[in-house]
Amino acid sequence: MGVEVCVKAAVGHPDTLGDCPFSQRVLLTLEEKKVPYEMKLIDVQNKPDWFLKISPEGKVPVFNGGDGKWIPDSDVITQVIEEKYPTPSLVTPPEYASVGSKIFSCFTTFLKSKDPNDGSEKALLTELQALEEHLKAHGPFINGQNISAADLSLAPKLYHLQVALEHFKGWKIPEDLTNVHAYTEALFSRESFIKTKAAKEHLIAGWAPKVNA
């Protein structure tokens, strides 16, 4: 039995890769390590019984490294992949592991915000500015010249941020954050990212119910 990973299918399109950034993080890790895998698309609105048996909470992604044991949680899965397939190393030094870690929660708060004066935009800008300063000092990636786990965690989240905020709020990352722009361009142009990203329309469809709630 080979490596298998269950990931979210697109909303309304069960045969198309969906918009889960945590699923994409696992796929990116496998792609960057050149690990062959079988991808199983899960319709999260109509979860099959076999999937609920291996993931009782119904969450994606879940990963099977070939031993029949299914593992949930992208943090745990990517660590298991790193240990099982150590080359090339994607280890991020502990002091850099949390770089950009607050961006996604700030993005979702701002995206759902109906009050322009609630501080959610400022909070997101503060986190993006912190990423800018880190990349300016240590870039082009979080750990310098080589891509690492922290980048593969952040890349799908920045993609969601870029697509969703422009669509729903007409908002873009400020142009003066030049290192952040160079960073997203470097990440989004990688073969691994192009292969594993959701189409923009599926990403927008995934966020629409949350934005309009």
Swiss-Prot record:
Presence of keyword Transferase: yes
Practical applications: Overexpression of DHAR1 improve ascorbate pool and redox homeostasis, and enhances grain yield and biomass in paddy field conditions.
Family: Belongs to the GST superfamily. DHAR family.
Binding site for L-ascorbate: K8, D19, K210
An example Gene Ontology biological process: ascorbate glutathione cycle
Keywords of this entry: Cytoplasm, Detoxification, Oxidoreductase, Stress response, Transferase
Residue span(s) of domain GST N-terminal: 10-89
Residues annotated as catalytic: C20
Top-rank taxon, per record: Eukaryota
Domain GST C-terminal: 73-213
Listed name of the protein: Probable glutathione S-transferase DHAR1, cytosolic
Gene Ontology molecular function: glutathione dehydrogenase (ascorbate) activity; glutathione transferase activity
Binding-site residues for glutathione, renumbered to this chain: K8, D19, K47, V60, S74, H160, W207
The keyword Cytoplasm is annotated on this UniProt entry: yes
Primary localisation category: cytoplasm
Subunit annotation: Monomer.
Source organism (scientific name): Oryza sativa subsp. japonica
Cited Pfam families: GST_C_2, GST_N_3
Function: Involved in ascorbate homeostasis. Maintains redox pools of ascorbate by recycling dihydroascorbate (DHA) to ascorbate. Involved in scavenging reactive oxygen species (ROS) under oxidative stresses. Possesses dehydroascorbate reductase (DHAR) activity in vitro. May function via a ping-pong reaction mechanism with an electron transfer at the active site. Possesses chaperone-like activity in vitro.
Reaction it catalyzes: RX + glutathione = an S-substituted glutathione + a halide anion + H(+); L-dehydroascorbate + 2 glutathione = glutathione disulfide + L-ascorbate
SUPFAM superfamilies reported in the protein's UniProt record: GST C-terminal domain-like, Thioredoxin-like
E.C. number: 2.5.1.18, 1.8.5.1
